[in-house]
Amino acid sequence: MDKIFSDKINILKALAIVLVVSGHLEFRFFDMFPPYSFQLALFFFISGMLFKEKYLDNVADFIKRRVKSLLLLYFLYSAFYAIVTIILAKLTGKFWGMDLNLYNFFVTPFLNGHQFDLSCPMWFVTQLFITMVTFLFLERMFRNLSTTKKSIIYTLMGFSAIPLSKVFPLTPVFLVIIRTMFSLFFVYLGHFYIKKIHGNYNIFTPKILGIVLCLQAVLWHFNRDFDPVHGIGLSYVLVWARFDSQIIVPVLTSITGIWFSLFFIEITYNYLKDIKFVRLIGENTYHIMANHLFVMYIITAVILKLNGIPISERNTHNIYWIFNPVQNTYLYFILTMIITT
């Protein structure tokens, strides 16, 4: 992997985690491409870009590396947040999470990852592990298939996940299956991009930009963002397979959002590549993912204290609540990114 490509991947990771944090604060950097319409698909896409085919013949090594890089740190953080949650419950009277037991500690992470509210964004980590291991085995099965046939199979997986989620009951296990089908498509897309498109075709021409913007304008006709309860536009919630009435729009907005992210990196690379803080964000996406809600909680507690408001006020809202968002959203964002990085 040459340095320029490695730097671009790191900046892309930084952008993806910035979109996650901004999404949890209910604002968007790219007004036409809101984060909840594509940011997690972007992470899966990046994982596909980084997938190495040498592991097709070394499954044990691949799983060992993924356990070490994803799951080991996950359960260390999970233990930490179990302690934090217990302490906060004693201090504030609010237990932010599910009951403490072995099932919720070891099994729930692989079902929905919401055993502790303060670390619930980490559901993505266990899902990424499931998706990447599944992708490895599927690639082993499909290694003799043509690129066209593989592309058809993965595309059918991605586009059929949403309809299936509406036909069958979303049991905990079936929810994992739906998320895995949806995410596999974007892992494959990232891998396909690196193998077949990157370095061979220029997909960032003015004509393609125009096509993407026109498509996104059409997709906005399916926007539900006319009521605050619906979030920040074109959103879907992958962890719960919450796609509302949409069938293919979430897949399409994920594709347009990923393309725009790649385009953004292409046109800003020469400026961003030398900014140390951007590099650090890209290198610390795991820790930012794990800790940003806790940092926001602490910021809220400090603001409440400074305003003479009891911490019990925080207990009456969900984990994503921030104090006076009209004035404080960007303060939360800047402080959270600095502290977690």
Where are these regions (language model features)?
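Alpha-helical transmembrane segments and their immediate juxtamembrane cytosolic regions
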Residues: 1-341
